[in-house]
Amino acid sequence: MMHSKKLMLGICLVLLIILIVGYVIMTKINSRSAQIKDTFNQTLKLYPTKNLEDFYDKEGFRDQEFEKGDKGNWIVDSEMVIELKDKKMESRSMVLYINRNTRTTKGNFIVRELWEDSKGYAQSKDTKYPVKMEHNRIIPTKPIADDKLRKEIENFKFFVQYGDFKDINDYKDGDISYNPNVPSYSAKYQLKNDDYNVKQLRKRYNIPTNKAPKLLLKGDGDLKGSSIGSKNLEFTFVENKEENIYFSDSINFKPTE
């Protein structure tokens, strides 16, 4: 009888330890997930910034990488990538370097093609069109003979100018991950086609699929902030061996080089 009581007490003690350890682990995971969400929210608060010149007066995260007196640079990048079956992969993107010290902005509109040659080797071709930004307008700095392309560049809008994540906290069933070795972190959500940002992308781009995208938020570097690290987001509509359709966007604050 005494042996039976000791055995039962031992089992209860083991179960209690398991419950305590499980609680500690779950608390740590939930805390990490909340920290990751908060880190992304700090960047997502920038959406929308309709006037790009507002970035001249926006302060980003600063650390020891910044020299004294350096106001830093915002780097804004939006890219649409489409690869259909048996077709070349084509991306059309624009990147701007917004210098807060000189209050000037320059960058490039980039058309990129990727394909495999007859021997199966990857080939690529990049065509860059230099631009500047004045009074919230994109202006090519070199003549462009193709009127359609010139208008595409002049009318280009970055995702940060129209994207809006005010409902991000309502997104359900997010897959949050963290790799302390890099370190890197991410959050993935399945969106619906009636999502505001998805509708905005379909309004501006000819997206050849009716599939609703997944939203992937990615970051690397210290969760508390780092000018060395980066954050970006990606709307993935299709991803397989034969086809890829996705839109990516990033806003990062860096020291002046």
Swiss-Prot record:
Top-rank lineage group of the source organism: Bacteria
Classification via Gene3D superfamilies: 2.50.20.40
Membrane protein topology class: Single-pass membrane protein
Keyword Plastid: no
Transmembrane segments: 7-27
Source organism (scientific name): Staphylococcus aureus (strain N315)
Subcellular location: Cell membrane
Protein name as annotated: Uncharacterized protein SA2274
Record key words, sorted: Cell membrane, Membrane, Transmembrane, Transmembrane helix
GO annotation, cellular component aspect: plasma membrane
Cross-referenced Pfam families: DUF576
Family (UniProt): Belongs to the staphylococcal tandem lipoprotein family.
Disulfide bond sites: none
Signal sequence bounds: none
NCBIfam families on file: SA_tandem_lipo
